[in-house]
Amino acid sequence: MRLNWFSPLPPAKSGIADYTRQLLHSLTMAADIALWTDQEHWDPALEAYAEVHTYRLQEMPWPEVNRATMSIFHIGNNQRFHGAIWQVSQRHAGLIVLHDLALQQLFAGLFREQWHDRMGYLELMERFYGETGRQDGEDFWAGRLTIEYMAEQYRLTQYAMDPALGVLVHSQRSYDELRHDCPCPLSYAPLPYAIAPPGSRRAEGNGEPNPSGPPYQLIIFGHISENRRLTSVFRALAAFPEQERFRLHVYGELWDHQRLRREVEDLALQDVVTLHGFVPNATLEAALASAHLAINLRFPTMGEASVSQLQIWNHALPSLVTKVGWYASLPTEMVAFVRPEQEIMDIQAHLRAFLSEPWRYAHMGEDGLRYVQTHHTPGAYVQALIDAVKDAEAFRPSAIAHDMARKVGQEMRRWTNRPAGDVASDLWARVGGFRHDHAGGHPSLGGLNYRHLEILKGLREKLSEQVQEMQRQLSKGLQAIQRAAWDECYPPAHVQAGRGNTHSLIHHRRYLTCARPYPA
């Protein structure tokens, strides 16, 4: 099985790039993987496991792409990393892996920041959310609504799933939310995370908490956008009487570095907070290994499971998380919850409790490590992924018919602004010589004529061509299998000569099960 893998690749500053790096070894044990990227640079170490192909949207190498059994598209809400991947998925149906359940940021980034397509964005919002969605889209475009509000109210997940042959999510909660609306097979598999990075407490065989301190080391890391709640953390520390007993280290790209630096200065936290920015993975792993407590808040949440949370547990670190989305489903013995409506108060309460009972928090990290080892193994994830690919492949003929029906419906809608079923019934009545009003149906629709029938006929012929092409491809594959079977049953004479009497018996037995001779 050959799979195309469209994903950010290291050293891209993306947790999904790290996910690909960690999974690649297990993945290549189960399938032939072709990595696809529009990045100019990638970690050469990846090429020890898989071929790396580059692409440009304007010049897609479709013959090479079409060699694979299935294409797997990794979709998240960062337009820089996933915009091109999503665009390829619209032109070449495959399996969508959703790394975020709310994709408003992805599409807002494409339509507003990259394409400057206001009307396209508003039409998209109206298509999925009606007039209210369009009006809020207007307000967002004009700066009257925030992207956080839009992501919470209007996820636009359906837009990414529309052309897919299959969808894979990483949490039971996401699966339950999408199962009734997904237009194709939907699968669920917990995120994989099994590699113990060099320098981690787990790699050293030591799950015990860092014995040093005070000051105790707090850590926040990853792609730091506004929903990571840094301002609330800063304010909680600024008003905490024993702030000198903590040091907060922030690693990762910041959405507004200057603003956050000003907040640190305004709150007089220069001796407590350090903004490190993006650092190499080895530096981050060393920081995690020496930390005492991780802060992994997200509000609003984008809905899916968190690679960074698995990375925290991989270091047996206790963590504070927001009680929303996937995080809310985590066992209470593994994380310390922070309520969105009481953020500052809850953060301070946990800091106070940590100073009083550090070992209670250390046990949370140890329980998290055991949870990762049990529920997030790469082997189980790869098997679930392969099963999802098989389901998607089986769905392919239905997807062609569904796509055709959607195109017909869109065409009919433009004719009369009436449901496609009404239009089809009216045209059928005209062909059969019947009238709707006499048959108890809808009144005959004005403006329809035989030109519209010709359009439908053209669409039908296009579908027929697609089906015939699929049949030709299947036929070629079957012929190749048949030829291979024939060669196995009836090898050339020079091969037979070297096999002696043992071959004669094997050859005789195989002959009984072989298909009829393959024609020359």
Go through each PLM region and give its residues.
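Glycosyltransferase donor-sugar binding loop
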Residues: R247-L260
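Acidic donor-binding loop of glycosyltransferase active sites
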Residues: T69, L165, L288-G303, L317
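Conserved donor-binding/catalytic core segment of Leloir-type glycosyltransferases
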Residues: L168, P211-R228, H249
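Nucleotide-activated donor-binding/catalytic signature segment of Leloir-type glycosyltransferases, i.e.
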Residues: L260-A282
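A short, active-site helix/loop in glycosyltransferases that binds the activated sugar's phosphate group
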Residues: T146-L186, I195
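C-terminal amphipathic helix plus adjacent low-complexity
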Residues: L369-P491, L505-R510
